[in-house]
Amino acid sequence: GKMWQMFYLGTPHTSPAPDRVPSFPYLTMKAQSSSPMGPWQKQPNVVPFRPMPGTYYSTTASPGFVVKYHGEYLQFFSASVQDEHPPKLIHRTIGIARTKDLNGPWSIDPAPIVPLAEQIENTSLYHEEADKTWYLFTDHIAVRKGVEYSDAAWVYWTNDLNRWDGAKKAVVLDSKNCKWSPNIVGLPSVLKVGNRLAIFYDGLPGNEISHMNRDVGLAFLPLPLRPPK
């Protein structure tokens, strides 16, 4: 059609003022517009999917990259489970939701693409036409003194979006090659620019691991992409 579709994160909970950092549950919300510049109209009656008790997405079912593949839309959404008992650790992964109607409900795969132990969230996909390989960029969550933070951008690759292998991954950005932000590397988003792949990400100068006062970083990978040997 001629409408732009947006899936965005919503939550009824935040940290106290003034920061108001979103907190669980993370939900997938829907809006649409006739132009990417807006105005955007929220669609509260459209519920793509929600966290479900007893599943790998019982705490988080938040939006991710959407791609049309073999006649249906796949959304690579962020999923998580939080332990019931202290210290109430959080386990994160990526799941696939499917639909043929972007304004309708989605069905969620019974298992994530990789185990919860991977501790990843957020997605951005790139398809390398040279060898028909899909690359999924995501961020890894680490814990320091009980505080969680995104410490690296990882990439997974596959030739079939329905089949993933957790061993087929590599570190793209972390403290070893991102010197301006020695601790925080999060929310990678990729875009082809000429013969390079641009990677936008957020970071924070200094030794803090705060959610606030972050900057946007830019890195590049040469194209075509090739899995490391």
Where do the language-model regions lie?
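Carbohydrate-active catalytic/glycan-binding domains of CAZyme proteins
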Residues: 1-229
